[in-house]
């Protein structure tokens, strides 16, 4: 009889993805870089040249150190490998404005590429620790993150270290999936000590670890109030608390006498509501409406008279002269300045309001985790916590959309009903990053790479995600509307590029210089907010979707 060969399980490796992406990243070394490049160069200089206690006081340059201590230690570590010819190029000079050449550019670009190896390693661990039946899905998720357009645009052209930082966050996600709760808490604490933007995810981590690891609700039976002491697994609480406290002690301990100064650097509340380029969130729509109303009222005064009959001050300016005075005196958000934004027509927004809105929607996201601390619920809660902070937060950067896309990538494979929201979020989110690369030389790379990624992975996710288990296929809005929105992104991007190219030639186009950024912000915010609505509906009202398969 012929020997029957056992079918070997498929091997899913990210090695080929790393090699191919490495070649592209090396080609991008001499490309455009943003002011963030000099920011990190200055941080290299500060951590290399100054004593540790002076790191958060140094202000020769406007690019002061404003990341948590672990990232400062990371910059110090990188500075130890700066070659002598790069030092002589000005890489480690503490100056007001950096003066450097190609040696510094090459060195810093290579540090980003080298540090991103951790991302590929963590994603490979995610694949290898998945069940054999889930390896294909895990591979799609891991590869989509590994070659994400977001990391290419933000890290390898614009210049940051997000791939390395998100690797640590993903390590905590992988630990949670494998029920390694102490490692989950440890890696999240480390990530938080590297970049404080991860603080937005703290509510979902706190509730998840509390419910899954610390509280003993499964076997708990209430007979008297004395029994409440047994609801807590005290040993687990001590171990988890020790891990978290020890991590923060290592990070912040050397700065114990300078914590007030450090905190003022980490949380500069003097910044305005919106960034120079409006992040595509709720406040982008709010700002756009204010801008349109201002133009309409000034161009067509009768519309103001009509509106003032139904709306009275302070909800609307008392007169057209007041509108003109506000336009002349304040930054109305259309100048591309990073400072306090004052709305001309609509009521002003204060930090307290943005905090309350963010907190409200984050609380709604974490409550279900108290009753069902499954990995699927955890990922849904993390995605919605990220969305709440992105949509309603104060001074949100467009790059923060990665805080939403990454956890959603781990969630979407669980059910095809999530795919419409995911496609909306990723397409709008990645396109919203295009203004970061405003030079014409980068137009083809950012558009072609992003569109190819979208086509490949939208089909891959559709093929590998689980089919809906409920009888009624409740999909947010209509899949066709999602496709229409996504296809309209293509002409929007090309028309804006044409306007930018012709803007210097025609005076009429120069009068609408900020129109391109406004269209990007407004249209992408519509897609992201729609994705939030869709995911929120499924998260709160489609119970069969969240039935745990663990």
Swiss-Prot record:
Keywords annotated in UniProt: Endoplasmic reticulum, Glycosyltransferase, Membrane, Transferase, Transmembrane, Transmembrane helix
InterPro entries listed in its UniProt record: Glyco_trans_ALG6/ALG8
Family matches, as Pfam families: Alg6_Alg8 (PF03155)
Record EC number: 2.4.1.265
Cytoplasmic topological intervals: 33-109, 172-189, 258-277, 374-392, 439-440, 497-513
Lumenal-side segments: 1-11, 131-150, 211-236, 299-352, 414-417, 462-475, 535-550
Listed GO biological process terms: dolichol-linked oligosaccharide biosynthetic process; protein N-linked glycosylation
Enzyme class: transferase
The keyword Endoplasmic reticulum appears for this protein: yes
Subcellular location, record wording: Endoplasmic reticulum membrane
Topology in membrane: Multi-pass membrane protein
Pathway: Protein modification; protein glycosylation
GO terms, molecular function: dolichyl pyrophosphate Glc1Man9GlcNAc2 alpha-1,3-glucosyltransferase activity
Catalytic activity annotation: an alpha-D-Glc-(1->3)-alpha-D-Man-(1->2)-alpha-D-Man-(1->2)-alpha-D-Man-(1->3)-[alpha-D-Man-(1->2)-alpha-D-Man-(1->3)-[alpha-D-Man-(1->2)-alpha-D-Man-(1->6)]-alpha-D-Man-(1->6)]-beta-D-Man-(1->4)-beta-D-GlcNAc-(1->4)-alpha-D-GlcNAc-diphospho-di-trans,poly-cis-dolichol + a di-trans,poly-cis-dolichyl beta-D-glucosyl phosphate = an alpha-D-Glc-(1->3)-alpha-D-Glc-(1->3)-alpha-D-Man-(1->2)-alpha-D-Man-(1->2)-alpha-D-Man-(1->3)-[alpha-D-Man-(1->2)-alpha-D-Man-(1->3)-[alpha-D-Man-(1->2)-alpha-D-Man-(1->6)]-alpha-D-Man-(1->6)]-beta-D-Man-(1->4)-beta-D-GlcNAc-(1->4)-alpha-D-GlcNAc-diphospho-di-trans,poly-cis-dolichol + a di-trans,poly-cis-dolichyl phosphate + H(+)
Family per similarity comment: Belongs to the ALG6/ALG8 glucosyltransferase family.
Function: Dolichyl pyrophosphate Glc1Man9GlcNAc2 alpha-1,3-glucosyltransferase that operates in the biosynthetic pathway of dolichol-linked oligosaccharides, the glycan precursors employed in protein asparagine (N)-glycosylation. The assembly of dolichol-linked oligosaccharides begins on the cytosolic side of the endoplasmic reticulum membrane and finishes in its lumen. The sequential addition of sugars to dolichol pyrophosphate produces dolichol-linked oligosaccharides containing fourteen sugars, including two GlcNAcs, nine mannoses and three glucoses.
Name under which the protein is recorded: Dolichyl pyrophosphate Glc1Man9GlcNAc2 alpha-1,3-glucosyltransferase
Organism: Candida glabrata (strain ATCC 2001 / BCRC 20586 / JCM 3761 / NBRC 0622 / NRRL Y-65 / CBS 138) (Yeast)
Name of the gene encoding the protein in the UniProt record: ALG8
């Amino acid at each position: 009889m012929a020997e029957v060969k056992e079918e070997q399980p498929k091997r899913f490796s990210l090695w080929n993805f790393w090699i191919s992406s490495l070649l592209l990243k090396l080609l991008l070394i001499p490309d455009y870089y943003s002011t963030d490049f000099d920011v990190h160069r200055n941080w290299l200089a500060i951590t290399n040249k100054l004593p540790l206690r002076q790191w958060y006081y140094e202000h020769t340059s406007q690019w002061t150190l404003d990341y948590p201590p672990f990232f400062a230690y990371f910059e110090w570590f990188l500075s130890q490998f700066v070659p002598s010819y790069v030092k002589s190029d000005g890489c480690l000079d503490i100056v007001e404005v950096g003066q450097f050449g190609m040696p510094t550019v090459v060195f810093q670009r290579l540090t980003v590429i080298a540090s991103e190896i951790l991302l590929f390693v963590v994603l490979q661990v995610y694949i290898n620790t998945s069940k054999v039946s889930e390896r294909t899905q895990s591979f799609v998720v891991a590869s989509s993150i590994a070659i994400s357009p977001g990391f290419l645009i933000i890290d390898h052209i614009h210049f940051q270290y997000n791939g390395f930082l998100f690797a640590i966050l993903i390590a905590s996600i992988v630990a949670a999936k494998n029920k390694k709760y102490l490692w989950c808490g440890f890696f999240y604490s480390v990530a938080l000590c590297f970049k404080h933007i991860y603080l937005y995810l703290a509510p979902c981590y706190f509730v998840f670890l509390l419910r899954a690891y610390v509280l003993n609700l499964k076997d708990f039976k209430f007979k008297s109030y004395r029994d409440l002491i047994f609801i807590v697994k005290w040993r687990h609480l001590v171990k988890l608390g020790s891990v978290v406290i020890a991590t923060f002690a290592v990070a912040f301990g050397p700065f114990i006498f300078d914590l007030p100064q450090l905190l003022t650097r980490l949380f500069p509340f003097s910044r305005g509501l919106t960034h120079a380029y409006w992040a595509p969130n709720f406040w982008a729509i709010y700002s756009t409406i204010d801008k349109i109303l201002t133009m309409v009222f000034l161009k067509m005064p009768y519309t103001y008279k009509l509106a003032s009959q139904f709306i009275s001050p302070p909800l609307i300016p008392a007169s057209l002269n007041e509108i003109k005075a506000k336009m002349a005196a304040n930054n109305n958000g259309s100048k591309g300045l990073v400072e306090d934004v004052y709305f001309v027509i609509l009521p002003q927004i204060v930090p307290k309001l943005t905090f309350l809105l963010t907190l409200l929607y984050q609380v709604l996201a974490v409550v279900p985790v108290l009753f069902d601390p499954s990995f699927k619920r955890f990922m849904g809660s993390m995605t919605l916590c990220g969305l709440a902070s992105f949509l309603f937060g104060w001074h949100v950067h467009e790059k923060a959309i990665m805080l939403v896309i990454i956890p959603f990538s781990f969630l979407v494979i669980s059910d095809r009903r999530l795919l419409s929201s995911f496609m909306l979020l990723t397409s709008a989110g990645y396109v919203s990053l295009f203004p970061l690369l405003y030079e014409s030389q980068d137009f083809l790379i950012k558009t072609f790479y992003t569109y190819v990624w979208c086509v490949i992975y939208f089909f891959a996710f559709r093929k590998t995600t689980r089919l809906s288990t409920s009888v009624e296929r409740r999909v947010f809005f209509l899949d066709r509307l999602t496709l229409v929105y996504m296809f309209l992104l293509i002409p929007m991007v090309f028309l804006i590029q044409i306007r930018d190219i012709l803007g210097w030639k025609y005076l009429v186009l120069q009068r609408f210089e900020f129109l391109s950024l406004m269209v990007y912000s407004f249209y992408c915010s519509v897609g992201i907010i729609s994705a939030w609505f869709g995911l929120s509906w499924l998260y709160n009202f489609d119970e069969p979707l969240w039935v745990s398969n663990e």
